[in-house]
Amino acid sequence: MSKRLQVVLNQDVRKLGNNGDLVEVAPGYARNYLLPQGIASLATPGILRQVEQRREKERQRLLAELQDAEARKVALKTVGKLIIRKQVGEENQIFGTVTTQDVADAIKERAGQDVDRRGITLPEIGKTGSYEAQVKLHPEVTATVQFDVIPL
């Protein structure tokens, strides 16, 4: 049974871990590569406390992001229906398409919130009418926004 050393990584290392991770490695790997290159530091009680503080700050930051996304979801629910104006032809067929950027602009105009257009999922929109879009605010939070497409 070989002895393993605990080290804290100072930068990302492929197949080993990310910056700030506490990992166990072979003594030779630590002594000959990780420590001399400055890639890792030996895990002392003081460094372990720093790692735990960093992890706690990261947990707090992620929790704050989630709470912010939940608050934005509630704000989007209270906005009501958005209105998107498009040029139409015969039988209420719209020219072009309603894009995610159109929906993001309507949300910004109505709710005052910046929303990343890449997080918006739209149905196929070919005619005027009422539609729903899914807006991903956070990996765990998705809001539904209703909007009407009307003629110019």
From Swiss-Prot:
Cysteines joined through disulfide linkages: none
Keyword Nucleotide-binding attached: no
GO biological process annotation, one example: translation
InterPro entries to which the protein is assigned, alphabetical: Ribosomal_bL9, Ribosomal_bL9/RNase_H1_N, Ribosomal_bL9_bac/chp, Ribosomal_bL9_C, Ribosomal_bL9_C_sf, Ribosomal_bL9_N, Ribosomal_bL9_N_sf
Molecular function via GO: rRNA binding; structural constituent of ribosome
A UniProt-annotated Pfam family: Ribosomal_L9_N
Domain of life: Bacteria
UniProtKB keywords: Ribonucleoprotein, Ribosomal protein, RNA-binding, rRNA-binding
GO-annotated cellular components: ribonucleoprotein complex; ribosome
Gene3D superfamilies named in the record: Ribosomal protein L9, C-terminal domain (3.10.430.100), Ribosomal protein L9, N-terminal domain (3.40.5.10)
PROSITE patterns (alphabetical): RIBOSOMAL_L9
Family statement drawn from the similarity comment of this UniProt entry: Belongs to the bacterial ribosomal protein bL9 family.
NCBIfam families with a match to the protein in the record: L9 (TIGR00158)
Main function: Binds to the 23S rRNA.
Protein name listed in UniProt: Large ribosomal subunit protein bL9
Taxonomic lineage of the native organism: Bacteria, Bacillati, Cyanobacteriota, Cyanophyceae, Oscillatoriophycideae
Gene from which the chain derives: rplI
